């Protein structure tokens, strides 16, 4: 996949001359935070397009991703990338997964974390959670999927002003030094261990 050539080995934007030679790829998102994270890894060749796409209600993250990706391609007719994220909470048996957006809208990140911690304490399932990210490239003839997984625990009260979504209540594993939530991490460090950074690098390597 030529437009991602070399991106798997870098955590910063590609050189300007390479950006000029490479075709621009659409990232389907209306979220500027997601575009910023992707550009930190793959460079400015990504440009955002905001489409109002139907979201199928499924606990299968790949099924949701593929439905979204091919519908987006049908509408714009250009090579593009779509992203989906699931948040699997141990105390809820892996729920909400891809439906986390609706739980966050209903409860907020702190409410979600407090509910999970209460159930986990009562049932002995703990405070663990898995952040799972998938990105899909579609060009009309083929699809390529990148996946990233970050294991961690939920914490309250929220910590940190960075990030978005559940970032301030998710304490990822794999950090050196003091434990910090996604919301407390600088961009490059979050990219290194986070589920989205892993997923983008996995896609870039294909």
What are these regions (language model features)?
Residues 9-10, 18:
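Short, positively charged and aromatic/hydrophobic N-terminal segments
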Residues 3-4:
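Aromatic (phenylalanine/tyrosine) cluster motif
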Residues 15-26, 33-206:
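Anionic-ligand binding patches
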Residues 8-9, 40:
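Intrinsic disorder/low-complexity segments in short proteins, especially the signal peptide
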